[in-house]
Amino acid sequence: DELGLAFDKTVNERLKGVSRERSFEIILEVNGAQETFLSEDKAKFIDKKNEYYKALIKQVTSKDILPGVMDFLNESKKQGILLAVASASKNARTVLEGLGILSMFDYVADASKIRYTKPDPEVFIDCMEHLKLQPWECIAFEDAAAGIEAIQAANIAAVGIGASVKPAVPDVFLDNTEELSIEKIENLLYK
């Protein structure tokens, strides 16, 4: 708002799964304003945007967990499935803590632990290595096209959730998190 740059739901969907810097570049591209800001100014605005974001995520609670996610996590833990989070955000742990589900995950890989962000597969490879798993032993879930590309580059089965995974083509597509179920995903992947 304060920069006079257009930002709507469509733009927001493009920002999923990419770094802070790339997010700002996308916003500038959409507005035809790539040349408007000096590098120092870009860095200031990226920091300011992150401060707004950090203030917002401090308000996250268990009420913000998407439908179907808690049942899926509980079902996974009950079956002894190792769970990891592969996030492009440095704030992943804070969000998981706010949601009250951090303890459900065996590992959290985020932008503070990796050099390259999605669509590079590094964050997924980091999760596999930490959990001592091979790609064929993993299934990864994503709500962003860059994430689907990263999963596939790591040779992991990709489950895309929601329309924002397009134009990427996951191995399994779910309309929303309410469709999450181990049985359903196994049936779709291994039919």
Please place each PLM-identified region on the residue numbering.
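N-terminal helical cap/lid subdomain that shapes the substrate entry/recognition surface
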Residues: 1-70, 75-79, 94
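Residue-level detector of anion-binding/catalytic polar loops
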Residues: 6, 82, 157
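Short, intrinsically disordered/low-complexity patches at protein termini
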Residues: 31-32, 60, 82, 148, ...
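Residue-level marker of alpha-helix boundaries and capping positions
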Residues: 63, 83, 137-139
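Asp-based, Mg2+/Mn2+-dependent phosphohydrolase catalytic module
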Residues: 70-77, 90-191
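Conserved phosphate-coupling serine/threonine residues in phosphotransfer and NTP-handling enzymes
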Residues: 87
